[in-house]
Amino acid sequence: MAKIISCNNQKGGSGKTATSVNIAKGLADDGYKVLLVDLDLQGNTSSKFIEDFENTSGIVEVLNGKSDIKDVIYSTDFDNLSIIPSKLEWLDCLEELARQDYYEEIKKKKNKSVYTIKTLLEPIMNQFDVIILDNNPSYKTILKNCVYAADLIVVPVNIDRNAIKGVDYTIRYIIDVITGSEEDLDCKFKILVTKTTRTRVSRNCVDLIRNTFKDLVFETTITNQIAPAEKQTFFEDYIMIDNLNTKVGKDYRSLVDEIRKEIEL
């Protein structure tokens, strides 16, 4: 039975895609069968692995009932790593989920919409060791779905005071969903501090996050690394865990090891 890891932050630009991709690649390198599910309407993750992702069936078609989820799983160039792509039409799916969620809340009906992602994944749970969800920022309905589906939610946050407000909102919402549920939800959640530097401001921000959220913060932090524009490739831009000669590569390797302990892989 697959473990589900979800990367969420209600604020955009927090590093969800880079986090998702590097965790996925690291676990695949460790020999686990990994499925990366793109739930972001921008399809950034999809575009890195599938050239014509906009014209490729994926999560949108599964949710619309046009495709079976087993038929939209695509292999990648990396051993043990597969992907289900997204596209811009995912926005329509998100809006429909939000409408269902709102309707069920105001009518005080049993909220079935929160099980949407969990239900979609059920037919393939025995095909993979780990399923990783790379999420759209904005929609609370998807975050709620992830709380119901995931074993672990990773909340990436940049070194930025405004970003810290975003992670505070995300964590509070996750706690509200867990405490407000009639079920005993077994969903862990932890903050991942990214794009750290050696500056005093960066160190102070890391200390602030650790002092505020205590044990809800990963020990590992991810170093900021910007490759020169002429050297930037897919690997330097997203898959940094492969280069263990760099600080950021070692950071992602450490994160994967920490996550394995967290979800008992």
Residue spans for each PLM region:
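P-loop NTP-binding core
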Residues: 1-265
